[in-house]
Amino acid sequence: MYKNYIFDLYGTLIDIRTDEWSEEPWEEFAAWLTGNGMPYTGSEVKALYDNEVNRLTSVKTKYTSPEIDIIPVFEVICKKHRPDITDEEVWKAGEQFRIITTKMIKLYPNTKKVLTGLKKAGKKVYLLSNAQRVFTWQELVKTGIVDDFDDIFISS
C-alpha cells in the first residue's frame, strides 16, 4: 500500500458550480464593492476584470495555458477607487467574488470518509491544485476538509 496520497480538489474531492458569465453575480459583486467604497456597476467591474485577466494571460510564457494569480486582478479593481486599500481588503474582495459566483459546492460522496480513513491508517495526504488560493482556502474550510491534509500546495 502507498504511504502518500496526492489529490486535486475540484472535480476530485469537491463538486462546484460557479457563474462568472451571467449579469447577476457581477451586479451583486459591484454592489458589494460600492458598499466598500469602490463604486462600480456590474458591467464596469466585469469589463475591468476581463481586461485584466486577458492582459495577464497574454503574457508570453513557455506554458500553453498558464494559470494566473487572480489577486492582482482584484488589486486593480480595488485600487482604482481605493489606492490605499490593504492587501487583506483586496483578499476579502476576492473571497467575496467567489462566494457570490458560487452556485453550488459540496464534497463528492465519501470524500471525508476516504481522507479520514487514510489519515487513520497513518498515510500522508496532500492536496495539489492549480486553483486560486483566494478561492480554494475558504472552500476547504467550508467543506470541512482543510485539516485532513498533511500539506497543501496551490499554484497561485
Question: What residues fall within each predicted segment?
Answer:
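Substrate-recognition element of Asp-dependent hydrolases with the DxDx(T/V) motif
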Residues: 90-107, 111-141, 152-155
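Active-site neighborhood of HAD-like aspartate-dependent phosphohydrolases
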Residues: 1-47
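A metal-dependent, Asp-based hydrolase signature
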Residues: 30, 42-96
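Conserved H-loop
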Residues: 146-150
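Pocket-edge positions in alpha/beta enzyme catalytic cores
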Residues: 18-21, 37, 62, 66, ...
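Short, glycine/charged-enriched secondary-structure capping and boundary segments
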Residues: 19-22, 140-144
